[in-house]
């Protein structure tokens, strides 16, 4: 009668260790480290429950040490069913310590024309990551200020619960 992998053992200095435990011991660290990203910066700001007032500017302060690498800058939004629109207009300003700055207007599409929310979610809460800049080079080392302001017609918009910024170095794919 044959034995299964679970029944096989390896003899090690007088002790027996199940092969499945040995495999698990070697595979677990590989899985753990392969699933982690090397974000340079990733943080969320909480929006008050009453809503995001257009006069309130959400600020983020990443420190960039490597100006040779290129980065992807993503905007993360957390929102609920109480948000009344399909999209969200944002004004984003990035400013270096030297005073250099650039401003963009970003249209974030949160739902399709039938009201089905994009992104991942559970219950009445959703999260979506939106690409803001891809392959971006920061011109100088130092602290940057990234400001995000809602640009909708309503002064206060309910349903947006958090806004975040994630900066990740671009990794080259083998063979490029």
Each predicted region: which residue ranges?
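Extracellular Ig-like/FN3 beta-sandwich strand-entry sites
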Residues: 68-70, 85-87, 139-143
């Amino acid at each position: 009668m044959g034995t299964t992998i679970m029944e096989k053992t390896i003899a090690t200095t007088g002790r027996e260790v199940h092969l499945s435990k040995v495999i698990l011991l070697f595979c677990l660290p590989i899985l753990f480290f392969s699933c982690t990203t090397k974000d340079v910066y990733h943080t969320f700001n909480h929006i008050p429950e009453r809503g995001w007032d257009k006069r309130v500017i959400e600020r983020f302060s990443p420190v960039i040490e490597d100006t040779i690498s290129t980065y992807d800058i993503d905007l993360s939004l957390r929102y609920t069913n109480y948000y009344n629109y399909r999209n969200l207009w944002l004004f984003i300003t990035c400013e270096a310590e030297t005073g250099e700055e650039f401003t963009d207007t970003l249209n974030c599409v949160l739902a399709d024309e039938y009201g089905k929310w994009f992104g991942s979610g559970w219950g009445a809460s959703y999260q979506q990551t939106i690409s803001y800049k891809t392959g971006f080079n920061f011109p100088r080392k130092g602290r940057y200020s990234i400001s995000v302001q809602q640009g909708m017609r309503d002064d206060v918009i309910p349903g947006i619960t958090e806004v975040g910024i994630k900066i990740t170095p671009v990794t080259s794919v083998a063979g490029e």
